A protein has these predicted regions:
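Membrane-helix boundary/helix-loop-helix interface segments in multi-pass membrane proteins
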Residues: 1-5, 11-12, 16-170, 335, ...
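Hydrophobic alpha-helical transmembrane segments
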Residues: 50-59, 128-129, 294-314
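Hydrophobic alpha-helical segments of polytopic membrane proteins
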Residues: 54, 74-83, 150-168, 173-216, ...
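Transmembrane alpha-helix boundary/anchor motif
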Residues: 58, 66, 135, 209, ...
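Hydrophobic, glycine- and aromatic-enriched re-entrant/interface helices and adjoining loop segments
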Residues: 99, 105-114, 199-302, 324-326
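Interfacial segments of multi-pass membrane proteins
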Residues: 140, 177, 182-196, 272-299, ...
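Alpha-helical transmembrane segments of multi-pass membrane proteins, especially transporters
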Residues: 151-156, 200, 231, 277, ...
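Loop-to-helix entry and N-terminal half of a specific, functionally important transmembrane alpha helix
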Residues: 317-356
Length: 392
């Protein structure tokens, strides 16, 4: 059932990406507001998505037959391999060696955390995320009886914040936030004391308020800060944008996404017919807006309902695990799914700033889909290697 839910999401993603490509390359690819042709069809993304999902399902089935404990025990291997790919991108930017580009910038941001090989791109922090979940689960399992002692908690926080710091330096704050939420979910599952949880939330709220009140004019004028301010003050009433051009550029993507979702109404305009509203990155970060336009409110509810079921199944598998190691792994993976879905949908609805977080299973990207199915395989491994079964 769990794998079928994931397969349904991948099938919906291929449908959405195929319709996006058809619109881009057909006579219907005329923007309703500008009246201009916005692009050329590109079915390659849909084909890559389908191929990656097919390979991913096979990988998930293979991993489900491998005891997750053995994968945790070989942590030095995957730590060296994954972070060995991440670290070069801290200092190497857009350096091409033959067909390989290290420190590739896949967008219009300061994020140089990608590798490009021919026509394919790969972000090693996605693979490192899986390694982090496994090593953090092992760390929690080893110290769970002393978790709330300041010394042990300090070591755990160091384990969490070192990768977050590395990813922040790369310029990928969206992924850094996801790592933070993963760590919080795993700490909560391990039984972190409420005094630490409440204290952490209070400290973060106070720090954010102080930073906004006293240092907002000094934090920087980069796109990330502007995107945060655009959510708080979308009409630029406080004059945060230095020019009207900057303001329009910052709000354009979310504004178009909001229009696309609203235009879908209850049942949508259809995947291969009806009105079309162009949205930048509609195949990637803003795929939810495309689905809203094509399938309407009902389609969005179906997509979110299936994703919610995947999250619940992930956490429930962890809750039924006979050992805490399996529980911690599922808590981390469930936290990753939950965080990405919440942030991505919030971006599309203009409730959160755009920080480059994709929608699991739906956003275009073969390597991302493969990483998701590796996570699915780990959850299935926890399920298969415990005598207690989900829901009895």
């Amino acid at each position: 059932m769990y794998l079928l839910l994931c397969l349904f999401s991948s099938a919906m993603a291929v449908l959405a990406l195929s319709s996006w490509a058809a619109k881009q390359g057909s006579g219907f690819a005329v923007d309703e507001l500008t009246g201009q042709l916005t692009g050329i069809g590109d079915y390659r993304r849909a084909v890559v998505q389908a191929g990656a999902a097919a390979i991913g399902i096979l990988v998930a089935i293979l991993l489900s037959n491998i005891d997750y404990r053995s994968l945790v025990n070989v942590w030095p291997v995957h730590v060296v391999l994954t972070w060995g790919l991440v670290l070069p991108t801290l200092v190497i930017r857009n350096v091409t060696i033959g067909p390989l580009t290290i420190g590739y910038n896949a967008g219009d941001t300061d994020n140089y955390s990608w590798y490009k090989l021919g026509g394919f791109t790969f972000q090693p922090t996605e693979l490192a995320k899986i390694s982090f979940i496994l090593t953090f689960a092992m760390h929690l399992n080893n110290v769970r009886s002393h978790l709330n002692e300041p010394k042990e908690l300090g070591k755990l926080l160091l384990h969490l914040f070192v990768p977050i710091g590395i990813i922040h330096i790369q310029g990928d704050d969206g992924t850094a936030i996801i790592y933070g939420i993963i760590g919080c979910c795993m700490l909560f599952a391990a039984g972190l004391s409420w005094k630490y949880i409440i204290g952490a939330f209070a400290a973060l709220a106070a720090a954010a308020a102080a930073a906004f009140a006293f240092f907002s004019d000094k934090i920087g004028k980069g796109y990330q800060w502007y995107r945060i301010l655009a959510v708080i003050d979308p009409n630029n009433e406080t004059g945060w944008a230095p020019s009207e051009t900057v303001w329009k550029n910052i709000i354009y993507q979310q504004q178009r996404g909001e229009i696309a979702i609203g235009s879908g109404g209850i049942f949508g305009n259809g995947f291969f017919g009806g009105r079309y509203y162009s949205v930048p990155n509609a195949h990637n970060d803003f795929i939810f807006s495309w689905i809203g336009n094509a399938a309407g409110f009902v389609g969005c509810c179906v997509v979110l309902g299936v994703l919610l079921a995947i999250i619940i199944k992930t956490f429930a598998t962890g809750a039924c695990s006979e050992d805490m190691l399996g529980s911690f792994i599922c808590a981390g993976i469930g936290g990753a799914f939950m965080a990405q879905i919440f942030v991505n949908v919030g971006m599309n609805l203009r409730l959160l700033p755009v920080i480059g977080v994709t929608l699991p299973f739906y956003s275009a990207g073969g390597s991302s889909v493969l990483m998701l199915y590796i996570c699915v395989g780990l959850v299935l491994s926890v399920y298969m290697h415990n005598t207690k079964k989900l829901f009895g």
